[in-house]
Structures are given as structure tokens and as C-alpha cells.
Regions:
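Conserved N-terminal phosphate-binding loop of PLP-dependent enzymes in the Aspartate aminotransferase
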Residues: 1-426
Length: 426
């Protein structure tokens, strides 16, 4: 029995469903491996030793490449000194200083473990700011796995979302209506830098929407929260809205800030400092020194290297190449979002049968793409990697052209999701 099959059989006995959460392969094509034995740079190897060029980057944490030497050297040095001690190491102050120096709106920093920690902390701080309850969010936007945001209904009570009001992303009138509904009880507006939901096309922020969110928070003495967990430091060396001239009061960070080591952060302006001291915010491993050392080294590389320009260059080459290939095989791709975080969907594929078959064709040739989640470009991805990818995806397109008439859809593992969407991928 292949090692992966054995692992899956054992996992089903001791882990609910065999795996859970966003890294579960339950909704992916059956050939996608669940377990990986190692990773280096832009590549990873599954439990049976198959090698892949990885376009998921661990769902975002891998910014500079798996096992990036400068980060791992900092990790090794700090581990030799201590990690989860009775109090934090001096590196916590160093990291807070580095975050404040890097992100324009930030005057202070607090650290935690996951994106859900950071976004949940942000809501607590916003509510503590003026003792109000209502938070305005964009409908269907993912801000983490807490009960107030998780996309799955199991165990979630109406009370968990009783004080959330929803608007449509990039719709100024909808945002104004939601704020009006909140009235004098508005605590904050929480949005992502751009719209990046699964199964849907991505949408960059419209300037009018971003500016209005800032203006409404100022007008109502509420806090603007920017959820940078997924996009942070992939679009800019600052907050993603900095170039729009819009600064939040609070920003939530995770994934890439420590290049794969477990750390997230809540950054805030002076205006929110007092409110940040009111809730009780803590966790057993929030103050671990090793991930903080990784983050200090990561931030140094963010400030000093050309990583951003490189990811834009390789991301653009991939996007252009795929578009040409799709057209040459008679398909139409819609690639949306920043090239560093591409979402790739087929135009004529409301039930995702084409996308599923295409990524499976790429996978069997050593290219790990995703059929419904946005992907990530890491700085370790080279132009040679992109050329190799395009050689393999061209073959996957050829297979798809041959097999498309006989494909049955939607794939059963996502049939309910497809039915609920009713073809709407906006």
C-alpha cells in the first residue's frame, strides 16, 4: 500500500473525517495528496515522494520559500536561547518596533497565533473603543474560523452573529445603508483589502468604497479594521490600502509575516491604544519567542529585498502564459485579483467540472494548482519554474480539450456549494 493511502486509512480512525479545516482535501479531486513529507523553496513532496511546484504556499504562509535560510537561521538562534518561557523574550519588543516601523498606520502591535485570533481581537478592541456592539462586514467574506465568521453552520448560534450587519463589497450605497442600520451602536467596519472568496472571482477595491469606509468610521467615531491576514505583505510593503491613501485604525496580520512560523498580529493606531488595553487577550503560545524571531527576519527581508517585484514578475508571466494556452486550446480563462494571488476559473464552467479536470491534469505532472481557492506566488518561484509549469499546464489543457465532452459535473464533493451559488461567481 502506498504510504499516503496508509496514512489516510490511519487518519480516518483517529481524526474526525481524516482531516479538517482549510487544508482538508475532501473537496479537491481524489488524486490530491493530503499529507506532505517535506518542502523546500517553491516545491514540496508528498508522503510517497512525488514532487510538486506549489502554487498554494501552505495557503499563504510561505512568502520567501519553504525553509528560507535567513529566517531559519534566526529561528535556530532563538531556539537555542529559549522559546515558550514564563515571559516573552526581548525579541517581542524588537518585533513590535519592526512592525510599527514598517506599517504606516501602526503605533503599537500585539501578537497571537492565527488569523482568527487577530480578527477576533480586532472586533473586541473595536467594541471596547466606545462600548458599542455593531460591526459592519462585507457579506460572505471570510475573516476566520470563529463562530462569528466561519462558513460552516455546525454549532453556530444566531446569537454569535446578532450584532453583525452586512454590506456588499465595493458597493458604497450598501455600506452607507449598513452603517445607518447600526446607528449610534456602530463599533467598527471590518473589510479585506480586496475581495478574495473561494469559488468566486476576485475584485480589487474601488477607491470610492475604501475612502467611504474611512470617512464613515471618522464620522461615527468607530474603528476601521483591515483584515490583512491573507494579503498582508503580498501586495505592498505596508498595508494594502496605503497606496490608496486610506489607513485603518486596526489591521490584522498572519500567514506570511513569519514565513511559515506560527504567528499573527494585531496592529493599531494611537487612537485605538486605550481600547486595546481593555479586553483580556492572551494565549499559552502567543508569546513564544521563536516565531517572533522568524518574523523579525522576515520583515528585514521584506524591507530590504526585491521580493515584491519578483513575485509580480513571475506572477505576470504565469498569468500571460496561461491565458495564451487556454485560448490556443479553445478555452476562456478568467484570472482575477493581483498576479501575486491569482484566482483562476474557467468562464464556461459554472459547475467547475473543467477546472477540476484541469488542475488534476496539472497535478499528475507535478504542478499543484487549486480549482476554487486563490493561489499564492512566493519569492522562491523562478522564471524557470514558471516555464516548467507552463509546459505541464499546456499538456493539461490538451487533455482537457480531449476529455471535456465526456466530463460529468459538478464534482460530487462540491455539488452542494455549486447548487447554492446557482452560477453566481461574482
Amino acid at each position: 500500500m502506498p504510504r499516503h493511502a496508509d496514512l489516510m486509512e490511519r487518519a480516518r480512525r483517529v481524526i474526525p473525517g481524516g482531516m479538517y479545516g482549510h487544508q482538508s482535501t475532501a473537496r479537491l479531486p481524489a488524486s490530491f495528496p493530503q499529507f506532505f513529507s517535506r518542502a523546500e523553496g517553491a516545491r514540496m513532496w508528498d508522503a510517497d515522494g512525488r514532487e510538486f511546484i506549489d502554487y498554494m504556499c501552505g495557503y499563504g504562509p510561505n512568502l520567501f520559500g519553504y525553509g528560507f535560510a535567513k529566517v531559519e537561521a534566526a529561528v535556530d538562534a532563538q531556539r537555542a536561547l529559549g522559546d515558550s518561557m514564563t515571559g516573552p523574550g526581548p525579541v517581542m519588543v524588537e518585533l513590535a518596533e519592526a512592525m510599527v516601523a514598517t506599517v504606516a498606520h501602526a503605533d503599537w502591535a500585539m501578537f497571537c497565533k492565527n488569523g482568527t485570533d487577530a480578527t477576533s481581537m480586532a472586533l473586541l478592541v473595536a467594541r471596547a473603543h466606545r462600548g458599542r456592539r455593531k460591526i459592519v462586514l462585507a457579506r460572505d467574506t471570510y475573516h476566520g474560523a470563529a463562530a462569528w465568521s466561519t462558513p460552516r453552520p455546525g454549532g453556530v448560534l444566531p446569537e454569535d452573529r446578532a450584532h453583525l450587519i452586512y454590506c456588499r463589497y465595493n458597493d458604497p450605497q450598501s455600506l452607507e445603508d449598513a452603517v445607518r442600520e447600526a446607528g449610534d451602536d456602530l463599533a467598527g467596519i471590518c473589510v479585506t483589502p480586496f475581495r478574495h472568496e473561494t469559488f468566486r472571482h476576485q475584485h480589487l477595491p474601488e477607491l470610492e468604497f475604501a475612502r467611504l469606509a474611512r470617512e464613515l468610521c471618522d464620522r461615527h467615531d468607530a474603528l476601521l479594521i483591515l483584515d490583512e491576514v491573507r494579503a498582508g505583505f503580498r501586495l505592498a510593503r505596508d498595508c494594502s490600502w496605503h497606496d490608496l491613501g486610506v489607513e485603518p485604525d486596526l489591521s490584522c496580520w498572519g500567514k506570511a509575516i513569519a514565513n511559515g512560523h506560527p504567528l499573527s498580529a494585531l496592529l493599531g493606531s494611537e487612537r485605538a491604544r486605550e481600547a486595546a488595553q481593555k479586553p483580556y487577550l492572551t494565549g499559552s503560545f502567543w508569546f513564544s519567542a521563536v516565531p517572533m524571531a522568524a518574523a523579525v527576519a522576515t520583515l528585514k527581508e521584506i524591507r530590504e529585498s526585491d521580493y515584491l517585484e519578483r513575485t509580480i514578475r513571475t506572477g505576470t508571466a504565469l498569468r500571460d502564459g496561461l491565458q495564451q494556452q487556454a485560448a490556443s486550446h479553445g478555452f476562456s480563462l478568467r484570472q482575477t485579483g493581483p498576479v501575486q494571488m491569482p484566482q483562476i476559473l474557467f468562464e464556461e464552467d459554472d459547475d467547475f467540472r473543467l477546472g477540476y479536470a484541469w488542475v488534476e491534469g496539472a497535478l499528475k505532472r507535478g504542478i499543484y494548482l487549486h480549482p476554487f481557492h486563490n493561489m499564492f506566488i512566493c519569492a522562491a518561484l523562478t522564471e524557470a519554474d514558471v516555464r516548467e509549469t507552463l509546459e505541464k499546464t499546456d499538456l493539461a489543457f490538451a487533455d482537457l480539450r480531449r476529455d471535456a465532452p465526456g466530463l460529468q459535473g459538478p464534482p460530487p464533493q462540491i455539488a452542494a456549494t455549486v447548487a447554492a451559488m446557482a452560477g453566481d461567481r461574482r
